[in-house]
């Protein structure tokens, strides 16, 4: 009788569990469908009712979407929210000739909406479509709120991203872990960095810079991360959470005196402590962190950890390197047996003199092949997979890096992006290439190169660049224009054919003032193309102005191209000033230096016409996170510091994240150049040799004062973008043309 009751209990209990699973799945499906409809409504608030959605299964384990017209509506089908959103974007681009980008959007849909006469189906050949770089979370996203994040997640879904890095909100998790290990909040103040420097703190490059970090910021980011992850997962994304790589607080030895630590330094910042992976507490801390992270955020079983980020290991001993990887992975797997380690392959490029075959194999082979995925971080330019036999059998992802420091310049490598993902996919030597992705340090710039890269998501063949660019211009501007087509042809073979610079050339305007044409440091002013060709494109886009002036995308492009032409021309003027100084021609020096200052002012006025180029937005968004005057001041200082000195007054990364923004030009760069010209002029009058080193020291003090200042910059655009660009063209075109000829 007992056995019969037990059997009844087991069967009935199983039925309850099974029915609960079905209900849970149905609820999840309902939530997913709701999330997709909400996305459509956010993107197309006036036309959302014209679209219907339905979920269908994968085909041969491949994500897919279908589009067709049913009863006068556009039916979007897909295996998850991402696929359906991608179907929507495909329809918008290819049927409605519309476009959604960070910098200019065209959603002027035809009325009535075009019908899809024959069902369209697209499958992605890539299991993973990765997005983001640790650096993006600071160079672009330091001050984002939930509204901005939601907009980005929509954009990710529309473009097929299914594997985003999600490292927001980890400091509160670390705080709880270290509190439980006996560290006080006061001790952690010297550990956690300020908000603009999280990336480099997380990767073990620095401690405490820009802090102390208020608890309110940690709590706010934890709440926001929950929203981010919920939205990403509802749409079908598998988010990558951070893991432990050994970076521990400065007072770690006080709590654990017998543990072995090594100290590393990075670009002049004070040493940080890295816990020896052989110490038993290494895996214990890593396990505790993952456990607390899962409790807080849930998991998709994907974890990011980067060992030796821009730091050389203390030894190339294979046993040591193997052991490091083993312990990092173990710390994940002890907390989550399903853990897969997502590793950025940046170290193999950045420190390629150290990372040879033996060393790379030692690091990678410690982890089972099915438990690690390597991000080939700069595939469009320096594909490490080609010199590592595709990471010796590890699954890996082809990525476009493109941008450094969210610098503002026209640059990219279109031919590589259009051809190489598909070529790698079909190359037997690529072995376990499982996806493609974007790993830029900063976004909200050069939208064309990202649109091009993401065109690869739903195709397995190279992109015909000439044809694609014509379609791009049509989508962007809303109508065909011959001059616009010619502009993009010129851009594709000049600024977007850059095989020389790393992330594009900077303008001499943003350099610390000097007579040198190319001051060096963290960037170059050397152009990888003939600037006269860009002037031709400038003339052509101005010729299209009357026809396309109402297009948001055109307004951005005409300002951006004008900006680049003027930024390039600044070097011509600066070098003439250098000649004037060498010739001791005081009159010419005054005339040309005045012209240089006017050029900066004109550039600032031009950029003030677009929200994309306002310093005020960056600073104001930072201050919005503050709950007290002290917090607002701290966040503003972080925001100012990152885009100027980067660290203290002597930091060699100064100007790494320079910005050609309205407000920065007049409020920072112009003032530096005015001080430079004033000092040189005084020296010329007194017949003295200009002392560059002394001037630099004076400038560092002024720059540090600017970092700590609080003057306000506008968040409101002023003037008409196209008219402003036309004025610049009228004023400078003939002069610039003559200078290059």
Give the location of each predicted region.
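Catalytic and substrate-binding clefts that recognize carbohydrates or anionic sugar/phosphate headgroups
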Residues: 120-121, 144-147
